[in-house]
UniProtKB/Swiss-Prot annotation:
Its cofactor is [4Fe-4S] cluster; [2Fe-2S] cluster. Homodimer. It holds the Pfam family Radical_SAM. Catalyzes the conversion of dethiobiotin (DTB) to biotin by the insertion of a sulfur atom into dethiobiotin via a radical-based mechanism. [2Fe-2S] cluster binds at residues 98, 130, 190, 262. Keywords: 2Fe-2S, 4Fe-4S, Biotin biosynthesis, Iron, Iron-sulfur, Metal-binding, S-adenosyl-L-methionine, Transferase. Binds 1 [4Fe-4S] cluster. The cluster is coordinated with 3 cysteines and an exchangeable S-adenosyl-L-methionine. The gene is bioB. This is Biotin synthase. It comes from the Bacteria.
Amino acid sequence: MREETVSWSLEDIREIYHTPVFELIHKANAILRSNFLHSELQTCYLISIKTGGCVEDCAYCAQSSRYHTHVTPEPMMKIVDVVERAKRAVELGATRVCLGAAWRNAKDDRYFDRVLAMVKSITDLGAEVCCALGMLSEEQAKKLYDAGLYAYNHNLDSSPEFYETIITTRSYEDRLNTLDVVNKSGISTCCGGIVGMGESEEDRIKLLHVLATRDHIPESVPVNLLWPIDGTPLQDQPPISFWEVLRTIATARVVFPRSMVRLAAGRAFLTVEQQTLCFLAGANSIFYGDKLLTVENNDIDEDAEMIKLLGLIPRPSFGIERGNPCYANNS
């Protein structure tokens, strides 16, 4: 049984996406204010606990072993080093710490046990913990839940049709199955996509429709802007129009009124004025820190200045009960 109260059709979402920008921002902002404290901003900190050497062929990713990029494979980080970085992040104001590993899937080995220990230790710091480890088994998801994991990130990247043009080593169905495993475990899901890869407006609309018609609505919907990386197939991809980014964020807010909408990778491309429009249009979460996995992010001091200028305040950790579904509505 689906847990949201609105059955979104593809045409519904298409109509929202193509609403005149001023009206779309107004509608999205009203929905944000009716479901959240409008001045709250969730600040997330991302740690790459295992960088590079991935066997997959995601066309946008510097960590693929199939491409010649600036990334050199590194061994997995030690528990103490990850916890120390997480502690510093919390001191800087982060309320969620995300752990990313360049794996196709998690394996039942000492490295997975190391992740469990990291999750427990960082949760003890008072921060929500999110992991992105690739595909999971039900047993692994249960272990992560028992360790205290709050959320699991597993993006769909784009529409089913466009996805096939950027990734061949993992199917769309594989990704959907992983989301099902995570939902079954009681862990919240973080799932969104990447814009600016050469996809069409319709691909962005279809991605949101796939997420909106699942049995469980994502707790977080990250919107990433492609960061073209030398050596990857998308290295020469021209930038997407800011207005398309804004439409995607605003549409996500309307369709997922109680989810966090995260302005994620690629935010460094945007001016403070453009980011402000994104916040008005429904984004209420960002990544905090100078680097996101292998790409640049906004300077921490500049972010702090922007947050102060806009009068934003940190969103506390554990604002939504773990695994609690977000109910979509049109109010």
